[in-house]
């Protein structure tokens, strides 16, 4: 049963990666509230957070309108939060925030954890397809290295960007920036 679930997840991640590589054209039909997508992604992971003993908090204001495929945005945020949960210590907390950039041109989602952090040697490759960092553990054993690649390609398809700051033992901050909708 575990193998079937893992295979299903791999196939799902591969399909998401393929879809995330298709450019998104801004239109009135694909305007969505980023805060709603972020809140939905966090709600989707409530059980996983509870099982890991990690508290996830969302902050920001609504609406923050962007042009984009709502499902792709939600999945990208979900992958960021899922990683933060998995790499956090039991009893830890993950902070998720939605805000506008200082110039007001971008919507910014930040996912902050105080977990293991990413080893410096892994940082240049962390968004590559199938790349798995050197800090794997029993909670990360089922991953195949597509989660952050999905985030990167979803960001690029939406004319945005994703960055990471991390220090071993201090945690990580992943920042997804997307152009705001007019």
Question: Each predicted region: which residue ranges?
Answer:
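Conserved glycine-rich
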Residues: 159-160
């Amino acid at each position: 049963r575990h193998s079937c679930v893992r295979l299903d997840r791999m196939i799902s991640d591969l399909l998401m990666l393929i879809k995330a590589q298709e450019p998104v054209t801004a239109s009135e039909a694909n305007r969505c509230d980023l805060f709603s997508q972020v809140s939905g992604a966090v709600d989707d992971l409530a059980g996983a957070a509870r099982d890991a003993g990690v508290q996830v908090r969302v902050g920001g204001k609504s609406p923050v309108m962007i042009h984009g495929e709502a499902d792709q945005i939600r999945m990208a945020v979900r992958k960021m939060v899922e990683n933060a949960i998995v790499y956090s210590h039991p009893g830890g907390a993950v902070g998720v925030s939605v805000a506008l950039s200082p110039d007001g041109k971008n919507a910014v989602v930040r996912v902050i954890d105080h977990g293991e952090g990413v080893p410096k040697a892994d940082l240049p490759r962390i968004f590559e397809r199938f790349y798995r960092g050197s800090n794997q553990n029993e909670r990360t054993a089922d991953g195949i290295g597509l989660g952050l690649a999905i985030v990167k390609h979803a960001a690029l398809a939406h004319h945005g960007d994703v960055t990471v700051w991390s220090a071993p033992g201090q945690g990580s901050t992943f920042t997804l920036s997307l152009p705001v909708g007019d």
